[in-house]
Amino acid sequence: GACLRDVTLSVIPPVVERGQQARLVCQYDLENANLYSVKYYRGSYEFFRYTASEKGNMPQTKVFPIKGINVDLSHSNATQVVLTNVGHSLTGNVSCEVTTDRPFVMKVARARA
């Protein structure tokens, strides 16, 4: 059976200095499912979304503006989002939400930054 397993979120480096770069790495095992989307949140606010390609279209990435969160789109993809010039506002709960398509399964992994 296709299922989504083992979603984890890592913050690299574990202690992010203000003004530095941070990488949020969302790891997951799709088994036989198809990826639909990966969304990243700070608290309840989404700041980055990756949507897998459908019907031959290119994968889509979208950034949602949140003060203090600067996404480096050129280095962000289905498994990581890179933040530059990190502000104090990264502190707290960040999460990644992985959704599969056919069968539809959604799982969330949380981390502290």
Cite the ranges covered by each PLM segment.
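Short secondary-structure capping/turn segments at boundaries of alpha-helices and beta-strands
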Residues: S10-I12, R23-D29
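Ligand-binding face of N-terminal immunoglobulin V-set domains in extracellular IgSF glycoproteins
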Residues: V25-Q27, K67-A113
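N-terminal V-set
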Residues: E31-K67
